[in-house]
UniProtKB/Swiss-Prot annotation:
The species this protein was found in: Mycoplasma pneumoniae (strain ATCC 29342 / M129 / Subtype 1) (Mycoplasmoides pneumoniae)
Cytoplasmic side: 1-41, 101-237, 294-642, 707-724, 789-801, 864-872
One Pfam assignment: E1-E2_ATPase
Compartment(s) of residence: Cell membrane
Family: Belongs to the cation transport ATPase (P-type) (TC 3.A.3) family. Type II subfamily.
GO molecular function terms noted in the UniProt entry: ATP binding; ATP hydrolysis activity; metal ion binding
UniProt function note: Could mediate calcium influx.
Residues that coordinate or bind Mg(2+): D587, D591
Keyword list, A-Z: ATP-binding, Cell membrane, Magnesium, Membrane, Metal-binding, Nucleotide-binding, Phosphoprotein, Translocase, Transmembrane, Transmembrane helix
Name the record gives this protein: Probable cation-transporting P-type ATPase
Record's catalysed reaction(s): ATP + H2O = ADP + phosphate + H(+)
Enzymatic class: translocase
Length: 872
């Protein structure tokens, strides 16, 4: 080591100035306040904030002009803007809190990197933080070290590195001063890459790239420049929200001007606030205020469930996208398999005993396995030691006197051990190399067995030995003759076996119309064998090597072996461009571009590197494919729940808009004489009433729907998130909205007629309107609350078991209870503009509940008719 002369202090400074520091910026946590502010980018939220400001202006000006300081109307006017504002803030808090929690969960899973490395500088070999390494530095490496930067090998003493995080190759790579590999950058054996681990030997290399200029750094830059993904539902809701907002804004202007004209432009100062409140009420009716809030609540509850199931969702919307996945491009090692080599079979030749084979494998082995399970060394050698029962082998009687390390050219490892006056040569390696070195052996006897195991994806190691009575390690001729005239002992077969639950998870994918695709850096035979065993592959013609891949035929294959990161990206893009929703699993730096490009990137939490975790949308903390499938099922449930809640939201928005419009211009004209005599400016529903309907009516059922277990077998049938209201959904929304608006107006009118004819109520236009509003308020809100039960099942409610939907029943009845509090408790009735002392008017109570029962009855009749025609 003393022959290496390192950089001087001046050269270090010059190199750092020219090439930069050896640092890769980690993705910082987005501050909570910034996440909170980002929630306000929605046009719906902006419009609601404008409505808040306008309502506040009206409250202040009206209060000052009318001297309402001690009037109950001041409370009513001030309630409206703050209810709208609380709605906006609640939504923003829910979304930002959950995303911040998910960020922190993902951040805690990041792995710790080696902080120091050994560098030759002008003062000799020193230990320095990896961040101080510069281009031109000479680095010393030995087993266990993490390579701190990219570089070129200067000296290699049986140097072997694990580069699976970058290349996908599951076995260590032999490194040498001269390239003995391919021409591709990652195939060159004389190059080292930042983040790789030295698993055997030692070496020296010169740093050629640091920080963002390393191979890892280049991938980081690709990941950081990626755009934020929107889920299919988010994309639809963004369009729907804009449509509702612009439509509402247009109607706001029209209704304000028309109503002002009807009231009289000549008295603008007295009438503008009345017209403005009516227009704001219309905007509040049109905009489904709970649109974002309830979706975030449903997403958050689903995310919590999945966190308990070992899946950490970094972004709320990813849960819904996961439910719509049609293609899963999954890695093999560690995801479908256990990421742990195991001996699955062995063969003892002739008179060899299992003890003989075991002893030879222990002696020709450089790995260590402690009693507590900790291990170091080559994964294959570790697997051999874990398989063997070393008790009784008397290994302490043998002393190793010589080793000829494994290298990729010879494909052999040899050791000489001494016991008493005998020297025993033990050789292990590939069958095709070792069998010809054995004496008295017809390799054709062994070859069929080995070929069969190889075709099943097993890695086979042959073992041979011979006994010498003298051995001189300094004698070159003796050393060269070691690997000859061997006695064949037998062989062992190893495999990274599939996880127990993987096969069932793959079967669940097929049943759910999801296509699993294996993309691996491993060998084709190994990948094919595992894929066939798990059910991914039925025809071997659907498996292909990366070098043979034709981009135009990507969708014909189900297994891709020995692929490059660029090819993995091409595979993902091919399926996406064909219109499929694609999930990708990965754990290495090489997987990061595909994780970003996919619709849902799933990174393994245990084996995943930080860059892959940053790129992913979901972190699978138990590295299990079955967890991804569980996530898809939860995602489907989430989408179904969102669809049901959105149906109810749109139902009340459409019905409420129709009621407010027709109420202002039809009921206002019909009852003009009675209202004008009573000196009252007519208004159908206040903004506060509509907000109560849009929030509390849907709030409890929305949470209940999210918690309620879904009875449908969602993973046993095709599923799509492409259409929000498919299978009659759009038609049902239209006719139910028309029905609900008709019934609301009908019972609103009946309530007003009753009040007009009542000796006490008929004296006040305000009381006449409150009587109608009480009935209409209950019909619109109560019907929407109970409609959540209708949405749970296609069959009539009378034909279902209430126990199966107990949580939704509780949610619906909780909403009804809120309405009862408002209409029966006088102070609340005052604030929300309903009639006080309703118990004195049982007819109005009958109207209120009669309209709800009529709506539900008509829905039940429609279901019965559909059931009789077999269209449910």
């Amino acid at each position: 080591m003393n022959k290496w002369t390192g950089l001087s202090a001046a050269a270090v400074l010059e190199s750092r100035a020219q090439h930069g520091a050896n640092l890769i910026p980690t993705k910082k946590l987005t501050p909570f306040w910034l996440l909170f502010l980002e929630q306000f980018k929605s046009l719906v939220v902006i419009l609601l904030l404008v409505a808040t400001i306008l309502s506040l202006v009206v409250a202040i000006i009206s209060g000052v002009n009318a001297n309402w300081l001690f009037d109950h109307n001041l409370v009513i006017e001030w309630t409206q803007p703050f209810v709208i504002l609380i709605t906006v803030l609640a939504n923003s808090l829910i979304g930002s809190i959950q995303e911040f929690k998910a960020q922190k969960s993902a951040h805690t899973l990041k792995s710790l990197t080696q902080p120091f490395t050994r560098v030759f500088r002008e003062e000799g070999l020193v230990s320095l933080p990896v961040g101080e390494v510069v281009v031109g530095d000479i680095i010393f490496l030995e087993a266990g070290d993490i390579i701190p930067a990219d570089g070129k090998v200067l000296q290699a003493n049986h140097l072997r590195c694990m580069e699976s995080f970058l290349t996908g190759e599951s076995v260590p790579v032999d490194k040498s001063v001269v390239n003995t590999g391919g021409k591709g950058l990652l195939e060159q054996t004389n190059l080292l890459f930042s983040g790789a681990q030295v698993v055997f030997g030692s070496g020296v290399f010169e740093v050629t790239a640091v920080g963002l200029n390393t191979q890892v750094g280049q991938i980081v830059k690709t990941v950081d420049s990626s755009a934020t993904k929107l889920s299919p539902l988010q994309q639809k809701l963004e369009k729907v929200g804009k449509w509702f907002s612009w439509f509402g804004l247009g109607l706001f202007v029209v209704v304000f001007l028309v109503q002002l004209g009807l009231l009289g432009f000549h008295n603008f100062s007295a009438n503008w606030s009345i017209a403005l409140i009516g227009a704001i009420a219309l905007v509040v009716a049109i905009i489904p205020e709970g649109l974002v809030t309830f979706i975030n609540v449903i997403f958050a509850l689903s995310v919590q469930k999945l966190t308990k199931q070992k899946a950490i969702i970094k972004y709320l919307a990813a849960i819904e996208t996961l439910g719509g996945v049609q293609i899963i491009c999954t890695d093999k090692t560690g995801t479908l398999t256990q990421n742990k080599m195991k001996v699955v079979d062995y063969f003892c030749f002739s008179n060899t005993t299992q003890t003989d084979l075991a002893r030879a494998l222990c002696l020709c082995n450089n790995a260590t396995v402690n009693t507590n399970g900790d291990s170091t060394g080559d994964p294959t050698e570790i697997a051999l030691l874990q398989w063997l029962d070393r008790d009784g082998l008397e290994l302490n009687h043998y002393t190793r006197v010589y080793e000829k390390a494994f290298d990729s050219n010879r494909k052999l490892m040899s050791v000489v051990v001494q016991k008493d006056n005998r020297f025993i040569v033990i050789v292990k390696g590939a069958h095709d190399v070792l069998l010809p070195l054995c004496k008295g052996l017809d390799s054709n006897q062994i070859k069929p067995l080995i070929d069969e195991r190889a075709s099943n994806g097993l890695r086979n190691l042959a073992v041979g030995l011979k006994v010498l009575y003298c051995f001189d390690p300094e004698n070159t001729q003796t050393v060269n003759e070691l690997e000859s005239e061997l006695d064949f002992l037998g062989s062992v077969s190893l495999q990274d076996p599939p996880r127990i639950e993987s096969k069932a998870a793959i079967m669940a994918c097929h049943q759910a119309n999801i296509t699993p695709i294996m993309i691996t850096g491993d060998h084709l035979k190994t990948a094919t064998a595992i894929a066939k065993e798990l059910g991914i592959l039925t025809d071997e013609r659907q498996a292909i090597l990366g070098v043979d891949l034709d981009p135009a035929k990507i969708m014909e294959y189900r297994v891709f072996a020995r692929v490059t990161p660029q090819q993995k990206l091409e595979i993902v893009n091919a399926w996406k461009q064909a219109g499929y929703t694609v999930a990708v699993t990965g754990d290495g730096v090489n997987d990061a571009p595909a994780l970003v490009t996919s619709d849902v990137g799933c990174c393994m939490g245990q084996t995943g590197v930080d860059i892959a975790k940053d790129a992913a949308d979901v972190i699978i903390s138990d590295d299990n494919f079955a967890t991804i499938v569980n996530g898809i099922e939860q995602g489907r449930k989430t989408f179904l729940t969102c669809k049901r809640v959105l149906f109810n939201l749109f139902l009340t928005s459409i019905a409420g808009t129709i009621v407010v419009l027709l109420g202002l211009f039809v009921l206002g004209e019909v009852f003009r004489e009675q209202l004008s005599k009573a000196n009252h400016n007519f208004q159908v529903f206040t903004p506060t009433q509509l907000l109560i309907i849009n929030l509390f009516v849907h709030g409890f059922p929305a949470v209940a729907l999210a918690i309620q277990p879904v009875q449908e077998k969602l993973m046993l049938k095709p599923f799509s998130t492409k259409n929000l209201f498919y299978n009659r959904g759009g038609f049902d929304l239209i006719w139910q909205s028309l029905l609900l608006s008709f019934l609301t107006l009908l019972f609103y009118s009946l309530g007003m007629v009753y009040a007009i004819n009542d000796p006490e109520l008929g004296k006040s236009g305000d009381l006449i309107n409150r009587a109608g509003a009480t009935c209409g308020f209950m019909v619109l809100g109560g019907s929407a609350a109970l409609n959540s039960l209708n949405l749970m099942v296609d069959r009539p409610l009378v034909a279902t078991n209430p126990k199966h939907y107990g949580i939704v029943w509780l949610g619906a009845l909780s909403s009804i209870f809120v309405f009862l509090l408002i209409i029966f408790i006088n102070p609340l009735g005052l604030v929300f503009s309903t009639l006080k002392d309703l118990t004195a008017h049982p007819v109005l109570i009958g109207y209120s509940f009669g309209g709800v029962l009529l709506y539900m009855t008509i829905n039940e009749v429609v279901k019965l008719i559909r059931l009789s025609y077999g269209s449910v």
